């Protein structure tokens, strides 16, 4: 009971801090009053329409308060990652629209790693018993696979990020239970999710330049998106070839879980 209470207190404190950060915006002619800033526009987007609206608002506000927008984005991203809340793909796309393709990619890779590590630590301190109680079969499966590949653990972790047998949020929660060293965990997230982050950020960068829906289906945009997808496939192909030679993988289990949702 104490671990659950402690987790709820941490969650409540972080939620309140993020609320203050999003409602105590410095005034500026671009964003009107703080009430307007703290309303519907500055909340987690749930679809592409809300995402586009939010990106337009923040891009205008960023012209006067660049540091504050950066801080707000980082806080929101770490909040989602730290508490294993699905939907970080929208924030990756938003990063591409706000910060450009390369700065956005660097930022998302770092925030994904730091946020996932925060989730690791929260699970280690408060959530081990809860995770084992609610997901005993999934934990047992991962435990068996981790032990089978202990000698090549880092590459196995990369494989799990690129070809998930289980959702990323669950891997973040269960990692301390599986005795995965935190340093290996951090760098496996940093490297393993580069292709996924790359696709999302580059897509956001492209979408932010479009002036109409028709432009989304232009040949130029289609070719750019295809090129992004091809580049992102290269690391996955290399890791998969290495895994087939050096890792102990159950192909049946992998096939059954390969379509797990890739939320971090």
From Swiss-Prot:
Taxonomic placement: Eukaryota, Metazoa, Chordata, Craniata, Vertebrata
Coiled-coil stretches noted in the UniProt entry, renumbered to this chain: none
Membrane topology of the entry: Multi-pass membrane protein
Sugar-bearing residue positions: 250
Name under which the protein is recorded: Transmembrane protein 41A
Annotated GO CC locations: membrane
Annotated domain remarks: The VTT domain was previously called the SNARE-assoc domain. As there is no evidence that this domain associates with SNARE proteins, it was renamed as VMP1, TMEM41, and TVP38 (VTT) domain.
UniProt-listed InterPro entries: TM41A/B, VTT_dom
Signal peptide segment: 1-17
Localization (cell): Membrane
Domain of life: Eukaryota
VTT domain as annotated region, ranges: 96-207
Transmembrane segments annotated in the record for this chain: 67-87, 100-122, 153-173, 175-195, 219-239
Family: Belongs to the TMEM41 family.
The keyword Transmembrane helix appears for this protein: yes
Keyword list, A-Z: Glycoprotein, Membrane, Signal, Transmembrane, Transmembrane helix
